[in-house]
Amino acid sequence: MNKILLQQCQSIIDPTLPPISNISNLLAVIFYTYDINWVGIYDYTDKHSSLTLGPFQGKVACTRIPYGHGVVGTCAKEKHVLCVEDVHTFTGHIACDSNTNSELVIPLIHDDQLLGVLDLDSLHLAYFSKEIQSTMERVAVYFTDELFRCKHV
């Protein structure tokens, strides 16, 4: 599945389109590939002490997450991948959807600058395997490139 997903993601990137179009399609591919209930981007700028909801697939979501809080904010602050098998045991977890049980959050970093995070949620405990995490880290490069383009167009 990894190879096919990576090929799909690469093939839908169209540099002639606005970055938001590419980001939206990438999220749709992920949403319909995995057994997840939510996937989206949280945008980060130094102007705010929070991450702001960007494009996503799934239920209505939290619109602002404080930097350093919850899984998303902690990932942003620490600038490393967080894979949480049971979000209910994560100190300070912010429950945008109380049915979510596991979460994978990947920082989107360009030239040592945090641009945002890619957030995936699942209803299943310990859903995100090492294989899924590895694949999503590779896919995150596309999101980083498009988010950088968004901020510098």
Which positions does each model-derived feature cover?
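A short, aliphatic-rich beta-strand micro-motif
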Residues: 102-109
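Short loop/turn motifs at secondary-structure junctions and domain boundaries
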Residues: 33, 96-100
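Regulatory loop-to-helix N-cap segments in sensory/regulatory domains
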Residues: 121-139, 146-153
